[in-house]
């Protein structure tokens, strides 16, 4: 396990994003995660500042929709987070990989009805595949890499990570962030046999397409496949 000396929690967040290939972040800035914004400033990651959190979340949703990689969104606590829930819900319904980082009140103010405090595990459970809170800055590399894995594995969807403000400014030694390993999903042999049987016996077949990762090559390949069988195609 490699450590690189003491860094703030904000720096560790950005290092973990870079380790996982992030090149763009959408956000609405807020005081609760200023340490992350400071680290982003010289990171080389493009930071798109939005006027409203719902738009920032939907921008991240669109990135995930077009690339198959998790879109990254950052918002502040309380109303910032609840505004972002609209984009989170869309990503959940449409199976789009996305990670929403939310600034949170400092750890010693939790469960004390602090200003703009929200219990996100309860609030966002229906909107996300996983909702986690990073209480220990040393575990940031672990949490962020796990968020990427959860967002992209099985049925893709959004993940929420909350970031206590004091945790982000704490300086700690932490292991070097590692990239997640994408798990490719594809039909098995029996599923393909079933598909072939259904297609052969269908009286009026039609393909309905959806999901992510539709590259130019994938579109051309499916176009040739559908045309060879003379089957119409629709999109969800």
Each language-model region and where it sits:
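N-terminal alpha/beta PP-like core and its mobile active-site loop of ThDP/TPP-dependent enzymes
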Residues: 2-236
């Amino acid at each position: 396990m490699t450590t690189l000396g003491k860094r703030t929690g904000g720096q560790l967040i950005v290092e973990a994003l870079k380790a996982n290939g992030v090149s763009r972040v959408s956000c609405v800035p807020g005081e609760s995660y200023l340490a992350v914004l400071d680290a982003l400033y010289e990171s080389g990651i493009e930071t798109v500042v939005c006027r409203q959190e719902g738009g920032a979340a939907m921008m991240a949703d669109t990135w995930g929709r077009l690339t198959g990689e998790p879109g990254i969104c950052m918002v502040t606590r309380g109303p910032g987070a609840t505004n972002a829930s609209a984009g989170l819900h869309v990503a959940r319904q449409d199976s789009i990989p996305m990670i929403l980082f939310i600034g949170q009140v400092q750890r010693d103010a939790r469960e004390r009805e602090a200003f703009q405090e929200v219990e996100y595990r309860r609030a966002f459970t229906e909107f996300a595949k996983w909702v986690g809170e990073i209480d220990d800055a040393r575990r940031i590399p672990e949490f962020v890499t796990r968020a990427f894995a959860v967002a992209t594995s099985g049925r893709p969807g959004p993940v929420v990570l909350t970031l206590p403000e004091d945790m982000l400014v704490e300086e700690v030694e932490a292991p070097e962030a590692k990239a997640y390993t994408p798990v490719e999903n594809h039909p098995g042999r029996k599923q393909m046999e079933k598909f072939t049987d259904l297609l052969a016996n269908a009286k009026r077949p039609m393909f309905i397409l959806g999901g992510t990762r539709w590259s130019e090559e994938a579109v051309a390949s499916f176009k040739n496949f559908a045309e060879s069988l003379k089957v119409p195609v629709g999109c969800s």
